[in-house]
């Protein structure tokens, strides 16, 4: 059981951002909806303080695609600024349903492909986010 009093009285370290990769998009949306609802229901005072700037938002998800080149290689992109934020990345390495094209042939993503995408997003966020989890 979480100590709700500690979570209600604790100060945020940095604004929150959630990066749910394509393999984990649905779970990321559920986590986002829960956090939005939780913060709105528990945050009824201290919202004027500058310490709570960007604490209450309608969406904490960021778009972080990993587009693939024709050779199968990919690059990690962050489509919005994450400077100074606490970035939480979510990935489902066992999601075998995602596919990509390599030299015109359809290829299913392996756990290693998902892990490589996670490393690409971490590299893209390196030195910008306050913390990466």
Regions found by a protein language model. Give the residues of each.
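PRPP-associated nucleotide enzymes
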Residues: 1-133
